[in-house]
C-alpha cells in the first residue's frame, strides 16, 4: 500500500513533514533583533570567518567570503544578503533564548496550525507543529539561530513567515478555499482574511523586506524577475549522517513593494544550495502567479 511505502508518496509534506529550515530562519532572528529597536539594517554586528560555538570546540564558517564581513563585523543587511552563519549565530546568542523563541512563537512555531477553508469545506486538518527549542545552552542556541540543530519547520510554516513579512508583520490564518459556489455559480460562502497574531511591527516588516531584497540584488541574482522587486531568503540545511546532504530552501514574496504572492519551497536531499535547488521553482511560481 502506498500509505505504508517508506518514501511516503501520499504524505502531504507541506503540512505534515518537518525539515530543518537552514538559513531561512535567519529572517526570524532578524525580526527579533529589529523589534528591540537596537538594530537597523545598517547596524554593524559581530561576524568573522569562523565562530566557535560557546563551550565547545566546534567552529561555524560561512559559505562565501563576503559573509565574513570586514574587521570582524558586518551590517545586518549584508549578514542576511550573504547568509552569514557567524553573524546570525552570534546575534541569536546576544539576543538570548527568550527573545528568539518568543518571536518564533509569534510567527506560529510551537503551536499546531489549523488549515481551514469555509463552513462548507468539511473538516479542517491540523498541520504538525514547527519547533524552536527553548531553555537551551548558548551552543545550541547559536545553531538553532541559523536553522540547524533542533529547529524544524513545515513548508506551510515557512510560507507563513514570508507572508507575515509581506503583510506588515501580521501572521495570517492559512486557508485552501477562497469561496464556495452553488451549482448555478452563485457564491454560498467566502473566506475572510483572518489575522492570527501581530508578530512584529510594520516598521520591522519594511526593514526586513529591504534586507530580503538585498538577498537577490547582492548575492542571488539568479532569483531576480524582470520588472519585479523580489524579496527572498535562501536556506541550505545540512542533513543526514555527517551532514552529507542538503535540504534546499527558499522563501519569499513579490512584488516586494506591493506583495501579491508569498512562497516557500524546499527540495529534500539534494547536493545544491537552496538558491539553485529551490530558487528556480519559486521563481517560476511567482512569474506564473504575477502573469495572471
PLM regions: where:
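Beta-lactam-recognizing serine transpeptidase/beta-lactamase-like catalytic domain environment
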Residues: 1-22, 28-267
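Short, gly/Ser/Thr-rich active-site loops of penicillin-recognizing serine hydrolases
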Residues: 186-194, 280-292
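A short acidic/glycine-rich loop-to-helix N-cap element
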Residues: 267-279
Amino acid at each position: 500500500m502506498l500509505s505504508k511505502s517508506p518514501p511516503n508518496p501520499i504524505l502531504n509534506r507541506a503540512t505534515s513533514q518537518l525539515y530543518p529550515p537552514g538559513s531561512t530562519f535567519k529572517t526570524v532572528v532578524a525580526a527579533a533583533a529589529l523589534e528591540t529597536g537596537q538594530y537597523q539594517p545598517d547596524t554593524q554586528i559581530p561576524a568573522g570567518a569562523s565562530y566557535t560555538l560557546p563551550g565547545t570546540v566546534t567552529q561555524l564558517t560561512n559559505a562565501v567570503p563576503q559573509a565574513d564581513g570586514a574587521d570582524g563585523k558586518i551590517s545586518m543587511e549584508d549578514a542576511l544578503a550573504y547568509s552569514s552563519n557567524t553573524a546570525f549565530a552570534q546575534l541569536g546568542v546576544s539576543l538570548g533564548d527568550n527573545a528568539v523563541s518568543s518571536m518564533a512563537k509569534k510567527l506560529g512555531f510551537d503551536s499546531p496550525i489549523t488549515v481551514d477553508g469555509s463552513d462548507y469545506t468539511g473538516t479542517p486538518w491540523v498541520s504538525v507543529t514547527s519547533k524552536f527549542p527553548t531553555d537551551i545552552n548558548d551552543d545550541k542556541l547559536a545553531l538553532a539561530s541559523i536553522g540547524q540543530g533542533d529547529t524544524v519547520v513545515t513548508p506551510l510554516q515557512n510560507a507563513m513567515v514570508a507572508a507575515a513579512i509581506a503583510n506588515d508583520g501580521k501572521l495570517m490564518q492559512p486557508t485552501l478555499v477562497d469561496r464556495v459556489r452553488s451549482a448555478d455559480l452563485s457564491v454560498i460562502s467566502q473566506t475572510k482574511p483572518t489575522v492570527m497574531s501581530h508578530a512584529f511591527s510594520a516598521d520591522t516588516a519594511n526593514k526586513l523586506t529591504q534586507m530580503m531584497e538585498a538577498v537577490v540584488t547582492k548575492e542571488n541574482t539568479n532569483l531576480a524577475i524582470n520588472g519585479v522587486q523580489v524579496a527572498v531568503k535562501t536556506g541550505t540545511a545540512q542533513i543526514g549522517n555527517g551532514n552529507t546532504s542538503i535540504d534546499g530552501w527558499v522563501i519569499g514574496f513579490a512584488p516586494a513593494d506591493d506583495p501579491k504572492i508569498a512562497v516557500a519551497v524546499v527540495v529534500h536531499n539534494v547536493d545544491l544550495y537552496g538558491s539553485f535547488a529551490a530558487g528556480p521553482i519559486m521563481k517560476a511560481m511567482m512569474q506564473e502567479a504575477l502573469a495572471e
